[in-house]
């Protein structure tokens, strides 16, 4: 079983407009509301793929109830209730652009943070892999993911971390290391303080930096150009075919789902990397974020090339 953690979930509200007009009224006909947050995208894709998955995180208020009520019944909902209201994130789709308005979310008390920590320990009993995705809510210290990873490691669970900024830096500088991290080039550049490109030799060099010591898998997203990955001392380049993209939103989360599934099923390197990329591509072919059409899985799987470099 796989446990997905979304500490700062949201209701995602999508407003499609032909044109966004400032300082006046914009009327929207087709409004879409869905449970949002990177970890919730992960759990929905895992569910589509047929994995047994349970979802946790911190939720509160009517928005929190909306999230629970709008997840598929086959996902085991194990959220921790807090006093604050779960946030709303607005996406305005206009003239080929995407403008996002993101609420910060609720402020958690020390008691709520401690409560979730105990809740997390309890949920580990029957899981093999834990995914930790997205931003931390207000009130949680930057090293909170580091704390959860330490607990998971003590219980023999594999962990996949997908976050950025101070939370990621705290993990990299801490003692407890995740099994997998999945930065993109922009996040990698931010971590290293220099611009990174798709140059394989340069990527090889930086991924051997002591900053990443102790992390089994480093999987760097190259967008439409696939993935560059390091597993222990072996490096891989993953070539993916060109596809017609409907929406790339959530594709990174879908890739995390594939990584988690590969770990849970003890798959070899090539199978894990291929599955992860297929699920990311399948999400990009869908209008709905965090959804994959498995009818196209086998065809894409055969078109991906994983090369040791």
Swiss-Prot record:
It comes from the Bacteria. Pfam families: PfkB. GO terms for cellular component: cytosol. One of its GO terms (molecular function) is ATP binding. SUPFAM superfamilies: Ribokinase-like. It catalyses: D-tagatofuranose 6-phosphate + ATP = D-tagatofuranose 1,6-bisphosphate + ADP + H(+). This is Tagatose-6-phosphate kinase. It comes from Streptococcus pyogenes serotype M5 (strain Manfredo). The lineage of its organism: Bacteria, Bacillati, Bacillota, Bacilli, Lactobacillales. The gene is lacC.
